[in-house]
Structures are given as C-alpha cells and as structure tokens.
Amino acid sequence: MKIKNWLKYASLKLKKTSSSPNLDAEILLSYVLKKCRTWIISNDFIKLTYDNLIDLNVLLQRRMNSEPISYLIHVKEFWSLPFLVSNSTLIPRPDTEILVEKALIYLKNLSNAKVLDLGTGCGSIALALASERLDCKIIGIDCVKESISIASKNAKILKLKNVSFLHSIWFSKVDNMFDMIVSNPPYLSFSEMKNVDKEVLFEPFIALFSSENGLGAIRHIIKYSKKYLYSKAWLLVEHGWKQKDKVQSFFYKYSFININTYRDYCDSDRVTVGQKQ
C-alpha cells in the first residue's frame, strides 16, 4: 500500500472519532516513518513496508478508540517546546500557556527568583518558565513518581539545568520558601466525568478531578501556600472557566492581596493571581 492510499484509508477510519482525521493520519505516519509531514506529503507515492503497516494499524486502532494522539506518539508541544508525555501525565493544553505568560510578567522585576510548580506532570510549566528565565531556580513537584521521571527526562532533553523535580504530595516534602508558586491542579468535579470527551478519560484521573465540586485541590493550595511564600510573593492558579468567583473567594479568605483573574486565549476565565501580604 502506498502512503497516499494509507492516508486516505486512515482518514476515513478516523472520521467518527477525530475532529482532525487527516492531520491525525499524517502525524501517525510521521511518527512511524520518522519523517516530517512535508516529506510524507511530497513522497506519498512511496510504498509502505509490511512492518510499517503493522505499526500503523496498531496505532490507528488505538486512535479509533479515542486514545489521544499525544499518547500514541509520546510527545506534545507546549510553549514551542517538545515534551515527552505518557498516560501518567496530563497532556499540556494551550490554555495553560496563559499561566506561563502571566508568571513571566510577575517575575519581570525579580532576579534569581525561586519558583515552585505544584503538580508538575511532564514538567511543561516548570520547564517553560526555566527556558525563559535561566536565572531563576524552578522546582516542580508531583505525587506520581513516573511523572517526576518523565519531567526529569524532559529537562535533560531541553538541556535546562535551572530546574529540579521532587516527588511530593502537594507541600508534604517541601521545606523551601519561594518568590512564586504556580499550579495547574485538578479542577473538574466528579459529576463532570460523564460529560468530558472520551479521549480525556485516557488521562490520569488524579490530574483531572478534584473533590468539593472540583475546588478541593485549589482550596488546599491557596490555604497552605502562604507558609512557603516570601512576603510580597505571588501565587498563580489555573482553574475552570466557571470557577473564578469561588477561587477569588479563597484568595480573599486566606488574606491574599492584589487579586486578579486573567482570561485565556478563548476569552474564558482561566488563571487567578494573588500576592502574600
């Protein structure tokens, strides 16, 4: 079977489960053949080997079952950087780039700042910040050991030495003070489980869903973060688009000042910031 024939075949198979069947087919081919998509399109007359077809059809079946494309090719781009991912880590979303963007703004007047990333996953937030601010010391923590392993591999791949990763359940192993804490915690409620896209359910439950109608982890972070923040230090938390008022109320309850909420690139409330007095 030629490349162009497999692309047509795969695209038809993926129409029921993917919003971008043509792109998905090209990405899978690129991964198996270890060629860029431009090469694939330009050389679609080439015949695929038997081994190629075996590998492609295994991946195609998994994608037809709604498994995220990032888990199939083991990589996801975030902040224009490539990140290894696995089913033990949340897949980085474009919405989260607003958290990085705002963190960099609040760090602008600080040199050699110490930053903590709570629930680091594959390390996308910590490493994005580290790549932009080589003078800063970034620590990423996660309760899943495999996530720490993957985040550490990403740091090596990106050759970033100003970041380290620690296995910890929130603040349980943290004994440092920081100029900033950032977090993209789980913030979906358990009741939302039945409404999310099927492919989201392939991602780790612990990284998606939280108690207290999705606000349990956020409340915990806001309540206990002050112990680890210097005076005038900042806390930035990502949350759901309907959670702004509740999240702001937690910041006020625990005596933060200069509280503000920022919208993501889809104009939805996404990140709330507060400063320790």
UniProtKB/Swiss-Prot annotation:
State the top-level EC class.
transferase
Ranges that cross the membrane: none
List ligand-binding residues for substrate: N184, P185, P186, Y187
Q: What is its EC number?
A: 2.1.1.297
The record's Gene Ontology biological-process terms are: methylation
Keyword Mitochondrion carried by entry: no
Keywords from the named record = Methyltransferase, S-adenosyl-L-methionine, Transferase
What molecular functions are annotated in GO for this chain?
nucleic acid binding; protein-(glutamine-N5) methyltransferase activity; protein-glutamine N-methyltransferase activity
Task: List, alphabetically, the HAMAP family matched.
Answer: RF_methyltr_PrmC (MF_02126)
Give the family from UniProt: Belongs to the protein N5-glutamine methyltransferase family. PrmC subfamily.
Protein's UniProt name = Release factor glutamine methyltransferase
Origin organism is Buchnera aphidicola subsp. Baizongia pistaciae (strain Bp)
The organism's lineage? Bacteria, Pseudomonadati, Pseudomonadota, Gammaproteobacteria, Enterobacterales
